[in-house]
Amino acid sequence: MTRLALLACCLLFMTGCSSTRHVPQGEYLLDKSTITVEDAPEVQAKSLQNYLRQVPNHKVLGFARLQLGVYNMSGRDSSKWYNRWVRRLGEAPVIYDDALTEQSARQLRLAMINRGYSNVVIDIDTTVNAAKRKTRVNYRVRPGSPQVLRNVRYTITDTMLRRIVFDDTASISLKSGGLFDRNMLDAERSRLTALMRNNGYYTFAKEHITFIADTAAGSRDVDLELVLCAPKPAIPGDTAEATRHRRYFIRNVYINTEADAPASARLDTIMSRGYHIIYGPSRYLRPSILDEKCYLNSGQLYSATNVDRTYEALTQLGILKYVNIAFTPAGKMPDGDEMIDAHIMLSRGKTQGIMLELEGTNSEGDLGVGAGITYQHRNLAKHSELLTVKIRGSYESLSGNLEGLINNRYTEMGAEVGISFPKFEAPILKKRYRQRVKASTEFNFTFNHQERPEYTRIIAGAGMKYKWNNRMNTRRRTFDLIDINFVYLPKSTIDFINTIAPTNPLLRYSYEDHFIMRMGYTFYKTNRPPLFNTSAHNNISQPDIYTFRMQAEMAGNLLYLISNATGMKRHDGAYKVFGIQYAQY
């Protein structure tokens, strides 16, 4: 309760500072900016917020401008380092600017025109509070008459391309009755381009798709024609070559694990599962892991998605510094389609690393020292496994009255060993399923020995877990196959626990002997788009972001079944492991 009160006081102090403290005389703080859309219920005002060129300072919890409050805690003398430091922590006040307001209005008008509205008018309503030196701005959007698609026609002379397009009619977004939205036109162009490039058309580009819009004077109806153009010939005037788009098939896949090797280096090429793998003397990656991480295969129709998935899977391997994929022509097929060779170039990073930490302490004259070392091996068994070993120790002497205590010093020794595999370590899973997700398998072992004046405590643990995500990282799952936590206090003073945790059961439990062997599952889902999935139209509104997290676990049930089946004796009405009662829930 005391912490909440202290936090509330801090919030009141920061927000209580004058918000116009650093607003120059004659200027106004932009206090609020809103958008009102009239006579167009289908347009949400919040979808237009990204077009504003000036917005007020950010509010926390919808009412407190904490960052502005921090900035206002600084003095007016910007030559002092303290004032500059405080200002960097906060956010400068947003000063109302007529030019930016006009620019925002122009951007809103252009956005509405692109969405299919004509005769768009943007009115700016400004309310000035001279006493408080603040300004509020409201943009009133009057969309005018919407332009509606009356007819939509796809002109595709190539029968194979036409079949690909109309086999996926459910994804077509341009339909009669919809708005003549320029953003939707570009989205449809991008969708069709991706569709073609995933069906073998390696050289297909957005420029091969054009739109012809026919609008009658005085009418809001639009007849739209999408034209899928033939490719331009490499030789001007060669009409035979320009008759149709060519499909591309992968002839061979070459994986060069020594992309940085000099031309004089001795390299060997082996065939493994259809791949030409080029190795140096070390052969630092086994063929099996390359096979699992590669989505390109000989004889396969070119697919841009498979190229992206190969990039993502290979960059997951910590031993690799960078990955590059290129394609080269490899001749023609009898039917006129093309063949290409895939060249996957891998550059090796550092295999091992070590980090040392040192620290010294002085607590009321009691000197102490601590040291830690971390060792990493990024390719333990040539599958890009990550081995991490951490060892840490600390010591602090004690002075003064030590009567009634069991130790005359603070000491701590700990070790942690973790191994992470960049795939599912489960032989029953087929390659097809393992390639559908980004997965890892983790093992960890921990041990910590503590000596304090009041107690000696041993903490140990071990675990194995699986983690897997979908490609877009919007769904994440963690399955703790086993997680063991062991706490044992061989020595402690008589009233130690009652002294430190008289009313806190959780803190008390952490200082009592216990053994937990649990199994758990965690599911996480969000609609937040990944950072790399940015649209060409950054101002297109995104849906409200949500996250969902679910966790379930159980502990002790397997131990109980084993104890019951083997006839183990109960102690004080409960089963024990290593003389310690285990948790069950």
Question: What feature does the model see in each segment?
Answer:
Residues D238-R434, S510-M517, K525-Q542:
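Outer-membrane beta-barrel initiation region
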Residues T2-L7:
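Sec-dependent signal peptide recognition
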Residues F13-G16:
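C-terminal motif of bacterial Sec signal peptides marking the signal peptidase cleavage site
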Residues A111, V121-D123, R136-R142, T155, ...:
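Soluble periplasmic/extracytoplasmic beta-strand elements of cell-envelope proteins
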Residues T126, P143-S145, A230-K232, P329, ...:
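Short, flexible loop/turn elements at secondary-structure junctions
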Residues Y117-I122, Y202-K206, L367-A371, R518, ...:
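Amphipathic hydrophobic-ligand
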Residues N198, G353, L402-Y585:
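Transmembrane beta-strand segments of outer-membrane beta-barrel domains in Gram-negative
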Residues S18-Q316, Y322-T328, M339, R432-Y433, ...:
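Interaction-mediating elements
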